[in-house]
Amino acid sequence: MSSTMAGVLPWGFTSSSNCVHTQQLGPSHHRTAPFSLGSNARAWYKIGMMNPVRNVVIVGGGTAGWLTAGVIAARHQGRIKADTFSVTLIESPNVPIIGVGEGTWPTLRSTLEKIGVSETDLFRHCDAAFKQGAKFAGWTTGAADDAYYHPLMLPQGFTQVNLAPHWLAGSNGQSFCDAVTPQGALCDDGLAPKMITTPEYQAVANYAYHLDAGKFAPFLQKHCTSKLGVRHVLADVQTVNQRENGDIESVTTQQAGVIAGDLFVDCTGFRSLLLGGALGVPFKDCNDVLFCDTALAMQVPYDTPDAPMASHTISTAHSAGWTWDIGLPTRRGTGYVYSSRHISDDEAEAELRRYVGPAAKGLTPRKISIRSGHRETFWKNNVVAVGLAAGFLEPLESSAIVLIELSAKLIAEQMPANRGVMDIIAARFNDVNQYRWGRIIDFLKLHYVLTRRPEKFWQDNLDPASIPARLQNLLHLWKYQPPWFFDEFDRIEEVFPAASYQYVLYGMGFRTEVAEADNDNTRTMAAGFLNEAMNLTKRLRAQLPSNRDLVKKIHDYGLQPI
């Protein structure tokens, strides 16, 4: 049992003398029950066990709300069709979507497939394109040739041998990414990760998506309501109605009256109307670790309709932050994420315009405030937060949507049978998400701590006080052994595997002093995988179409259904 679950009883009671009674074995050796609930606790426990969870109410739409609705509804389709379970989403007609164009993680492919979405339809209706990773330019020194890839493919033979020490022993000037995977070369060439004959959701090279968040949410809404039986209510929530124990009983809306539920999912964005507002769960700020607190977003048209379209996100370092550059079929989504403590808004806009070039003329950027961090608790009473209501981190590694997916899947799979067991599931959910958010913060910070850039923003990121202790310990360890499974990366809760850390570390010039301890068999195996990566690179460069060509063919002909 985890430390956070110890002593937790249903309905939030803890094992204090008021509600738990324990007796020792007496002289007569008659064994009593280990504990018993007090009369009030027993009453609440029985009430909880008699209250099944049948009605899930999601407050808030957008990607978080509709993706969560889809995952839960797909998982419980049998009950929805039998009319013993319902998913209702309440969405304000007056609140705009925050999304500025999204990068995603490969998990979205399996998520969309499981809820029954056609990949062809995704491309046709969401201005979607392929994403094979991220290119980080200027993060180490700022020199013209300073760039590395964090691809979405694992190194060849990743589950059998760690190629990092063998690359370190004799890289011959070849980057780690190019030595162990073909994906950096595919991105350099602007190639797609599959062919038109590759079935939906299948891959030649691992991939995620770039997509328009403003189109993605309505696309999910249509699918959820027409195919999965999700009830859609367009209304503004005016009042949150709570029971004596703090549970939310219902919400009162302006247009649709009172809507009751057994489990409420807070997808109300930064304001966190239910978890942060009604239940008062505090926000845990991490701006002392991740300094960027503002973004300027700009949608940039292509010079020509058939202009090359990058199959990777481009993250370019600047004086006080970094720009994102996402290629969609009809435009580029760009923006500058920066620290307002290190640069003014006007100076940041000037840097963004210099990066975009002449195409920025006449375009007005949209300013977005960023508060990096998360709620201290993600699930309290009968309320669980997903998406921005749970927290937000700068979009450096496309973690926003994958966190929505993982939370939605966990809620769907662990859906409480009744209120009596909900607190047990909530404790598990909180443990998993505390770990995930902490590790993502570590991974994002890793991108900043190996820099040699001279600007104050970058130098401030090297302050040990801003580097989490776990990351400091791992950096010390990695001086002598490369990241691998035994650095806790075998946990199911991990979002970024050991390979992701390798790509960033060695892409930024980190050196590991590896002792030559591998036997001949391991060296032979590693040499074979490195040679395999080289041959695969040659073959795929000759076979795969360009990113834009494949997206156009998908629009014209569609992908083959599985």
Task: Tell where the protein language model's regions lie, with residue ranges.
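Long, low-complexity C-terminal extensions of enzymes
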Residues: 413-562
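Short FAD-binding loop at a beta-strand-to-alpha-helix junction that anchors the flavin cofactor
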Residues: 378-396
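N-terminal Rossmann-like FAD-binding beta1-loop-alpha1 element of flavoenzymes
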Residues: 54-83
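Predominantly flavin-linked oxidoreductase catalytic cores and closely associated redox partners
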Residues: 201-321, 327-335, 339-348, 408
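Dinucleotide-binding Rossmann-like beta1-alpha1 core, especially the glycine-rich loop
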Residues: 96-187
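Low-acidity, Ser/Thr- and Arg-rich intrinsically disordered low-complexity segments
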Residues: 2-4, 11, 15-19, 28
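Glycine-rich FAD pyrophosphate-binding loop
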Residues: 74-100
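Conserved FAD/dinucleotide-binding core of flavoprotein oxidoreductases
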Residues: 317-369, 391-402, 414, 422
